[in-house]
């Protein structure tokens, strides 16, 4: 039998871009949620998140059907999840004064997302990596989207991972080869094949207009722990 315990947690007023010291400086927080967003830890514990909830290394963040979420990381990076998507924070580390400790390692498990890279992506590009079902994505300071159409089908498209770049560039690599993708270009990565350029697959990420508004610092975050 599954039980749910809800709690209200104080969320500190954090100056994310300032590289605040302490545990929160190496994580991120929920900026916006429309629908349902959960975070599952490695031990199986699941939390239902709300704006200002903290996210941590090891969390798998998942949106349900008809749900969107935006996560702000302490280095200034921003991740927007579309409905029915899962995204894991494999290892994130950032302290403004210690770039040698930078790390931004994540994985797209299902669905899709858009990411705007932050300070880790601009000053420590070799320490930024996003895993997908068919390749690993590295960046050169950028804004890009990634969609997994293997775990969940995308209407009218081949089963593959699709990537689109808005700004900057990325490099997608697997055991069969690699491909650089510049702004305005799109990529398809099928299982057992090298990454290659493709036409626009038409996979948009369109969060609610409310996501365009800044989130006020401080306040409270309401969370439910599902057991």
Task: Locate each region found by the language model.
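Intrinsically disordered/low-complexity terminal segments and short unstructured peptides
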Residues: 2-3, 19-20, 62
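Bacterial N-terminal signal peptides
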Residues: 9-19
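Flexible, surface-exposed loop/linker segments and immediately adjacent secondary-structure boundaries
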Residues: 24-60, 64-69, 73-227
């Amino acid at each position: 039998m599954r039980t749910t315990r809800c709690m209200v947690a104080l969320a500190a007023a954090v100056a994310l871009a300032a590289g605040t010291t302490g545990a929160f400086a190496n994580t991120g927080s929920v900026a916006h949620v429309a629908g349902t967003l959960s975070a599952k830890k490695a031990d199986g514990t699941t939390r239902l998140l709300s704006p200002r909830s903290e996210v941590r290394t090891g969390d798998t963040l998942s949106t349900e059907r008809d749900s969107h979420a935006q996560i702000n990381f302490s280095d200034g990076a921003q991740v927007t999840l579309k409905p029915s998507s899962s995204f894991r924070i494999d290892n994130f580390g950032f302290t403004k004064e210690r770039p040698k400790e930078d790390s931004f390692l994540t994985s797209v498990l299902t669905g899709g997302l858009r990411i705007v890279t932050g300070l880790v992506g601009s000053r420590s590009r070799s320490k930024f990596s996003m895993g997908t079902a068919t390749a690993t994505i590295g960046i050169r300071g950028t804004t890009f989207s990634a969609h997994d159409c293997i775990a969940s089908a995308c209407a009218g498209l081949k089963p593959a991972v699709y990537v689109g770049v808005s700004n900057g560039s990325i490099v997608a690599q697997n055991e069969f080869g690699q491909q650089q993708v510049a702004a305005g270009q799109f990529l398809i990565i099928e299982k057992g094949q090298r990454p290659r350029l493709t036409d626009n697959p038409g996979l948009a990420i369109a969060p609610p207009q409310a996501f365009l508004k800044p989130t006020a610092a401080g306040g409270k975050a309401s969370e439910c722990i599902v057991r």
